[in-house]
Amino acid sequence: MGILKRKLTSFQIILLGFAGVILLGAFLLTLPISSKTHEWTSFIDALFTSTSAVCVTGLIVFDTATHWTIFGQIVILLLIQIGGMGVVTIALSLAVISGKKIGLFSRETMKNAISAPNVSGMVRLTGFIIKGIFLIELIGALVMMPVFCIDYGAEGVWFAIFHSVSAFCNAGFDIMGTKSGEFTSITHYSAQPIINITIMLLIIIGGIGFLVWEDICKHKWRIREYRTQSKVVLIVTAALIVLPAIYFFFFEFGDLPVGDRIFTSLFQSITPRTAGFNTVNLTAISDTGLYLMIILMLIGGSPGSTAGGMKTTTVAVLFSSAFSVFRKKDNAELVKRRIDDETVKTASAIFIMYISLFLFGGMTISAIEKLPITSCLYEAASAVGTVGLTLGITPTLGIVSKLILILSMFFGRVGGLTLIYAAFGANKKQVAKLPTDTIAVG
């Protein structure tokens, strides 16, 4: 990193880091050793799978269990882990372990990678993140292991590890294809409380963000001492779990027993915000339910987490900005704090970028493939939100449509602002201010 810092910005290093890992993963997945047919996998399909894994999405063109060998599955799991932790986080951790001095540029890069407010305590925070990730994934695997081992014997150990990492990293990849049928996700365990609860908790913990973890561990139940961002994340996350779950409970899964209905409703309200697992056949959900899931997929998780999407805080800032207009206030306000105008402008830019890419991707795929617009918009939202839920059209798409989804997944993981800052730089000073004028809106 010392050589690169003289030529590249921190945003460019983040961008190139993800791109490099994706290309390496694609190369490994093309090899005959990765495929159960022992034949070369086409580069576009290997690139799609690698991008989906590194960008912790979960959209696939092949069933993970039936197409990929154990070598291929290990490659995919490592790509998921790298993508979830972040390339920069891993690089900084290795540097610390090797005893290298961590300079200001490296700390700045890490700050941008995890959306931290400043570079203070970055090395300590990195250690906290790494330890936390492996501890939580280990606990998740140990909890699920007895269930999987009862069903699959010794193979259940691998099932527990794979699904724990995939759930925590909000990836949504599964290896159930050889047991319950291709592309079935974890529908076989829709009524199994241990698997359901564990995966839901892993998704939530992975999706709330590393800075929120730090506040929870440091301040415990003293919520008043949490960062403003942590308070907003927890409030919005709770709302986005409870409200959709109520809708699913009353309007989508009325034919299920009450216990199964509660689990299924909660699971389907949690998983669209970038996880990608499903316990029901998604094609059986109404159009209203599908569009609700599209909204959840676009919102995604929280800053500095393993999740993608435009982020919970972005939506909170936009809503608070709108309410400030309704109430004739000068500034947006959240949890008794004023939100500066720069944050509101940034949130607006992120919202426009995600919505534009989502609409462009969905409409273009629909036009090219001659498929229903709802299915294509669902797939586009799943890609740009790095979710992985699908109505089953991804394996049938042509090369151009796959490339659109690949670019959408990459955009969704690294973030729109990272791409813009990598290309054009950040915080450029405005030389002169133009005259102010008014434009009628609304």
Q: Where do the protein language model's features map onto the residues?
A:
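Membrane-proximal intracellular helices of multi-pass ion channels
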Residues: M1-G442
